[in-house]
């Protein structure tokens, strides 16, 4: 958040969490970075408020669902009425469950020119890294592709 040229950094970051304590912890970490990037911390659990926040984002923004909603708890942090900024990146970190945020982003992908990223691939990267460490094996790109193909067959159904 501070080493890149100013033109390569976000003009602002908005972080929404249902728990003020988590926001406070994140604020303390960000303060150590001495960044000039403006960060807004919003304590909120109402998806309609998140819809309003979403509508205020600039085109080509990065929108990440790291809430666990759609995986650990039902729902999505935004409602079906929420509109993603044109050309934005919608990144669903969840890899299982109902994946409401992913479904919502996919529904708007064509019309809003969204770049939608599914957390499944990142989940696999994490697990394969653990396998490399625990079993002292190297998983190169070819092995990763083979393991991913097998894992994809076992993936729970959901939006893609």
Regions found by a protein language model. Name each.
Residues 15, 19-22, 40-78:
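Rossmann-like NAD(P)-binding element
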Residues 70-146:
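Rossmann-fold NAD(P)-binding glycine/threonine-rich loop
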Residues 1, 23-26, 101-105:
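Hydrophobic packing residues within well-ordered alpha-helices of enzyme cores
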Residues 141-160:
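A short, charged, Gly/Pro-tolerant segment at domain boundaries
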Residues 13-16, 62, 88-95:
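Alpha-helical membrane segments in multi-pass integral membrane proteins
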Residues 10-12, 59-60, 85-87, 113:
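A general structural motif
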Residues 7-37, 44:
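NAD(P)-binding Rossmann-fold cofactor-contacting core
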Residues 2-12, 35, 108-115:
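Conserved S-adenosyl-L-methionine
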């Amino acid at each position: 958040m501070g080493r890149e040229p100013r033109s390569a950094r976000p003009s602002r970051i908005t972080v929404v969490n249902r728990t003020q304590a988590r926001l406070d912890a994140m604020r303390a970490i960000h303060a150590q970075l001495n960044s000039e990037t403006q960060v807004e911390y919003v304590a909120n659990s109402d998806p309609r408020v998140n819809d309003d926040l979403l509508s205020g984002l600039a085109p080509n923004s990065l929108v990440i669902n790291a809430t666990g909603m759609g995986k650990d708890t039902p729902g999505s942090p935004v409602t079906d009425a929420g509109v993603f900024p044109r050309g934005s990146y919608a990144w669903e970190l969840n890899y299982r469950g109902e994946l409401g945020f992913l479904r919502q982003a996919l529904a708007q992908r064509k019309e809003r020119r969204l770049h939608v990223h599914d957390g499944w691939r990142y989940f696999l990267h994490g697990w394969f890294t653990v396998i490399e460490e625990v079993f002292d094996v190297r998983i190169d790109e070819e092995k990763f592709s083979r393991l991913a193909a097998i894992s994809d067959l076992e993936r729970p159904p959901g939006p893609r």
